[in-house]
């Protein structure tokens, strides 16, 4: 009787009645003698998401090694309730206890691995699958596809998917959602078309929802409209998740009018819909409209839709557009509404003040957080670097490690950037060691930051060693190394690397060409620089020269002493020269004691607005040419107008 009642409670997820039955069983001492009863109680608590109670009952099961069902239930409960580490630990304990996993064990432990991005553990479990009777099981193989796709191991996901003897809708959707998470839009569209062509399956609601991340991140308006049309034809467009997804795609595709039209349709919106509309306005630099939507949430019956995400988005908009008073108002609302106790909101407020430049407020908010996490520290470390307080980031980095909080990639990137700003080789080398020990040294972004740090600390050989040992290079990797060769005066090495880059099939971008022009300038490679700029102007690299490229060419000519040619180059620019271009030329006039040309350039600079830089450079140019009266006259003008040079200081670690 009790077993049938328990079965009813499990099916209806009636926790209260189930606990009453459990109490009766305890009073009659029936639970200790029956593993069947204990397994069903574990099922009850697991189905009701009462994970701790489920584990307590699970631990009472006698001879658990003969009953794999209980292990499966417990692993599933952990994996489904964000206790991924415990699910993985229990799986290994299951193996050590001599219990053979079933086909229901693997999908949930792989789900835990995907949540933890535990690639090594997942690959080990894959080997266990291959040694079991479930290597071709569709349910298990789909879980493997989902694991590899979510972890970014897309080639392995394709391999497992292609080797599946039979694929259902769930397997196709796992591929689509996994590739979509990594913004592989072309692959997502291809899979969407192939599922019908190859296996005769029509995309369902889950397929469409899985496509939205790739469509949104790519800003794919044309494809987004096509998917919207498909949803309308198939009757999916009335689904709330689909409406919100389409809204988000339009907003991220810079088509905010269409996004607003979807938002204004008569349907019951949830908190995700409101947040998507606010985020769309913020992303499209329409902070006023974002504020209006946020206010609309507060004054109508939608106040329950206000979430930490919505508060974070509106604060992000205030930070981006320098609206300190608006951000403070949102901060006050968060305090009054009780959101200030939410760690996500607290971290967002720190990030807002840090991005705005109000580090005092950021530190004050940081000090008020009781239990800080890695995001709390990351927000402040990044803020310190951005606001020219890089030395503070070292203290915070040390503090978080002593507090038992493990730094992540964002932390390390912030600290390495601080090391670059200060040329702090000691701190940078220590951070490099931490990256190696904890497995971050294979990350492309970390390697790029390490190269930048070593380059600016004068250790070009170490930077090159990092570059040579990288598993995967992106365009930033090449650009960083090119800039490194350039600032160290190794123009020929930079040109050689540039050629190697093209030979490997990597197309240069505007930053690449800026780096190679800068390298030519610092090495006096005038002819090579001219040839490169002419190729760029002809469109050989599909990059249009911008003001920075013209500034580099001006510096190249002026630094080599071709002042008249540089001046002629500046006058023939397709747009008005800015203060940087003219400052570069004026600095060269000082170096080569060309007071006449310096005077002409100074007049152009002053037409853009008088600056301390232009007057100081002109005064120095006159002094270098021994025109002391003119130099004194410029100094007097500078003094009368209050354009005084601010004394500065700098330091490096030795």
Curated annotation (Swiss-Prot):
PPR repeats lie at residues 1-32, 34-64, 67-101, 102-136, 137-171, 172-203, 204-238, 239-269, 270-304, 307-341, 342-372, 373-407, 408-442, 443-473, 474-508, 509-543, 546-576. It comes from the Eukaryota. PROSITE patterns: PPR. The keyword Repeat applies. Pfam families: E_motif, PPR, PPR_2. Residues 581-654 are annotated as: Type E motif. GO terms for biological process: RNA modification. GO terms for molecular function: RNA binding. Disulfide bonds: none annotated. Keywords: Repeat. The keyword Repeat applies. Belongs to the PPR family. PCMP-E subfamily. This is Pentatricopeptide repeat-containing protein At3g16610. It comes from Arabidopsis thaliana (Mouse-ear cress). The lineage of its organism: Eukaryota, Viridiplantae, Streptophyta, Embryophyta, Tracheophyta. The gene is PCMP-E91.
